[in-house]
Each structure stands twice: as structure tokens, then as C-alpha cells.
Amino acid sequence: MEYRRLPKLSSEINAQNMNLLDVGVAGVGSEGPDPREVELILEEILSLMQLGEDYTEFMVSKIKGLSNVDPDLAPRATKSFRSGSFSKVVQDITGFYVILEGFFMVENVRKAIRIDEHVPDSLTTSMVDDVFYVLQSCLRRAISTLNISSVIAVLSGASSLLSNEYHEALQHKMREPNLGAKLFLGGVGVQKTGTEIATVLNNMDVSSEYVLKLKHEIEEQCLEVFPAPADREKVKSCLSELGDMSITFKQALNAGLEQLVATVTPRIRPVLDNVATISYELSEAEYADNEVNDPWVQGLLHAVETNAAWLQSLMTANNYDSFIHLIIEFLVKRLEVIMMQKRFSQLGGLQLDRDCRALVSHFSSMTQRTVRDKFARLTQMATILNLEKVSEILDFWGENSGPMTWRLTPAEVRRVLGLRVDFKSEAIAALKL
């Protein structure tokens, strides 16, 4: 310990930063021990701790194997050895290890954040892989010490770093003002801004996955190394805290995606507003003409493609799917309101069904997740508006609904039936739904 000046080194680290995980000093270059030299010392300490653990097990087994002595002597001798000078030295070394490992982890995570840069042919920046590599390395080394206290300390430090400095770094770009204006400067999507925004969201998405992978790996290793139930319970508690960071990153991601959608939807809204002017009180000639000259669906899909699809190559598959689904939610909500204000002939109901099918078909090709549930209410409205007579609804309602789950309430079903120009209000009111 004196040869490596561990007490002095630990004092320097504590003096440099009383709280190693203080968010306020992230990214600030400070004078102190060189993390590369600290890593070499950590590897030496690791070897000492492993040897110490082996020696302790050897001595305890020897003491317990003394069969020719007083049976009461072995427990006393074991206790005496575990509280003796050798154990005290091991304890001191463990304390130094925790301080040095904490310092090494913090300094390298901060450095990864500080030198974060775009990586060619990657959807994320360098910070993501670098930070999780540092955390993985430190936690693996902590487990290799075979000391549960060391593992708990390093695990807590890792969780704290992720929840503070790393979390802050992930969100920093999304707080930039006028992001929407920069994304569509001059009326078209700006590739550079789109790449920057998409990369920030990708960082959040991948970080959420990496947290769960790291948690799983540490859990597996700890189960092998620490069989005692009490030790496993301690690890489980810390891992739960680590796992919560995946949820935190997902929440930040969802907020970021909603922010992105809010910059895109105003560019689609004019096409949606035009839908309000389209008539659904159709004659056979008008219905036939709509089949050739689509009134609005293709225009809406073109607006979505123009303003959203160009971001696909810049985003993770998961993020792009979520992005498109948020746009769908916006569209469907607005379309439901618009359709509830219209009047329909039976052919108009058939037209709405055709429109819904076209929307579902196109959006299904844009995303890997199912979109049918998003259009369920609109599709059910179309089904109702396409009926021959009011009483036909009973063929689809209640016990007759089959595999279909109704998303419309009985009151909404009556309201939709009331949109048909040829359905009598008395017949609708008489329905038992």
C-alpha cells in the first residue's frame, strides 16, 4: 500500500472532488491522478484482493480441519482470524479499491461525454458505446474482486452516473430552441439538422437497450460469484435501480419523439383540413369517380412521406416505428373528429371504408408494428356507415361481435348511425345496445 502510495492517492482523489458523482463538474478538465495510471493500480489491487480471498478461504478451511483440537476452538479461531491484522489489511485495500474504481469510472465516463462525436456509418454518437464499455469494464472488475461491498459500491456509482451526467448529456441537444424551424428551413427537410435530432433519439433508444443488457450480464455473473442469499438480495436491489434507468431513458426518448412529431404535424395539417371539405353524401357516379380520382387519401400519404419518411434512414428501426405511430395517432384523432361532423350516404360509408383500407395498407408498409389497432375506431365507423339498415348493427354487436372488439361506446355507435342521411332517428333511439 505504501509502495503504491494508496493512502495519498485516495486522499488526492477525495480532495479533488468530495463527491465523485457531482453533476456540476461534468466535462471540466481538472488536475488530479492520471486515470490510466489508476487503472494499472486497480489491476494490481484486484490481484491482491483475489489472493487475499484465496488465502482467507485456505486458512479458514485449515482451521476447520483441525479435528484433534477442542471443537469449540475452531469457531473462535476462525473469528479471530477474520478480525485479525490480515483481514484488516484486506479491508483497507478494499476501501482504496472502491475509491480508485469510482474515480476511474467517473473520469472516463466524463471524458466519453466530453469528446462525444459523430461516428461514420453509425446511428449513434461515440459516447454511447464508450460510456457503457467503461461501466461494463468497471463492474466486471468489481465482481472479480469477489467482494460484495465493492460490487455494491461500483453498481451504485454506475447508476448515479447514468441518472445524472449521462442522462443530462443525452437530453442536451433536444433542449435547443427553434428546433422545428431548423428542421424544415426553407420549407424542406434539412439533412444535417435531421441527422442531429435523429442521432440524439437513437442515443436514447440504444442506451435504454444497453442498460438492460448490462443489468442482465451483471446479474448472471453475480449469481455465479455470490451464492449467499443475503449477497444476492443486495445485488438485486442495486440492479433494480440500474434497470430503472432503462425506463428513464425511454421516457426521455418518448418526450423527444413527441417533440419531433410536433415539428412535422403542422406541415401535414393543411392536407387534413382539406378533408373537412370533402363530401361523403355520394351518388353512384361520384363514388365511381372517387375510385379513379382519389379525393384526399393519396394527398395525405404524400404529405406524410415528404415530411417524415426521409428520416427513416437516420433513425433506429424502433425509433422510426414509434415516430410513425405517433404521426398516425395525430392523423386518426383528427380524422375521427372530421368524420363525426359529416353526413354520409351508404356509398359514403363504403368510401370511408375504402379510405381506411388505403391508409392501413400504406402505413403497414411504413412500419414493422401493426397499425390496424390505431385505425380500429375509424374502421368501425365505416362498418356502421355501410349498413343496409339500422337494425343490422345488432348482427355485429354484443354476442354477435365475434373476434371483433368494439372500440366505440354504445352512445358513439348511435351517434355514428345518426350521420347516415337515410337512417331514421326513431329507429336509432329504439336500438338496445
Report residues per predicted region.
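Short, charged, low-complexity loops and linkers
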Residues: V28-E39, R82-Q91, R114-H118, Y280-N290, ...
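Extended, low-charge, aliphatic-rich alpha-helical segments
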Residues: F81-S85, V89, F104-G187
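Extended alpha-helical "rod" scaffolds
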Residues: L42-T56, V60, K64, T94-F96, ...
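Alpha-helical solenoid scaffolds in eukaryotic proteins
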Residues: V28-R36, E43, G84-K88, D92, ...
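Extended alpha-helical scaffold segments
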Residues: M1-E107
